[in-house]
Amino acid sequence: MDYRNQSLGALAIAIPQATKLFRQHQLDFCCGGKQTLLRAANKLNLDIDALEAQLSALQTEPHSSEDWQQQPLTNLISFIISRYHDRHREQLPELVLMAEKVERVHGEKPTCPRGLAAELSAILEELTQHMYKEEQILFPMIQRGMGSQASGPIFVMEAEHDAVGQQLEVVKQLTQNVTPPEGACNTWRALYTGINEFITDLMEHIHLENNLLFPRALRGE
């Protein structure tokens, strides 16, 4: 199968386990989901043949992931809210508190991620507003069968997805790609574990919206 000329978003839909592989290689399948595997791999100097072999192996593995290409959009929306929106509302406040503690206790160390708490607070504020707009405006439009008329709100939501993607890059820079330094305390390690989980969740969340929900809604499904 020709994987290299397919978009990252299409591959993530067709091979659900591919999202973990893409994350390992820093391949942006959510906000950058429209670029082909070949183009994305070339940007990062990745071995395209090795990536295709890994994707081929993943495609033969059995999996139990929901096929959201076939499910009604109302079901997909309910899943996004319960699995991702509600989860982000739990994750981010705790991450902010832990980041504040790490900066307060370890602020004099050169490895301290100074500015991380402020960046996470900004993500919390902006993502909270973003999810509210989706739940109060865009999702009800789609649920009422008006998705084909929602190009304006969808454009805004995708732009906000791009913005939070840039904020995640700042978080990665502040945390040495979310890697705790040698000798990091338990709070520091727990913070970075939580950030990694949040990034994984958010990328899957944006992928489902950008590459599945929004295109299907615009087609009038």
Swiss-Prot record:
The keyword Cytoplasm applies. Keywords: Cytoplasm, Iron, Metal-binding, Stress response. It is found in: Cytoplasm. Transmembrane segments: none annotated. GO terms for molecular function: metal ion binding. It comes from the Bacteria. Its main location: cytoplasm. InterPro entries: FeS-repair_YftE (IPR023742), Hemerythrin-like (IPR012312), RIC_family (IPR019903). It holds the Pfam family Hemerythrin. GO terms for cellular component: cytoplasm. The keyword Metal-binding applies. GO terms for biological process: protein repair; response to nitrosative stress; response to oxidative stress. Homodimer. Di-iron-containing protein involved in the repair of iron-sulfur clusters damaged by oxidative and nitrosative stress conditions. Belongs to the RIC family. YtfE subfamily. NCBIfam families: FeS_repair_RIC, PRK10992.1. This is Iron-sulfur cluster repair protein YtfE. It comes from Yersinia pseudotuberculosis serotype IB (strain PB1/+). The lineage of its organism: Bacteria, Pseudomonadati, Pseudomonadota, Gammaproteobacteria, Enterobacterales.
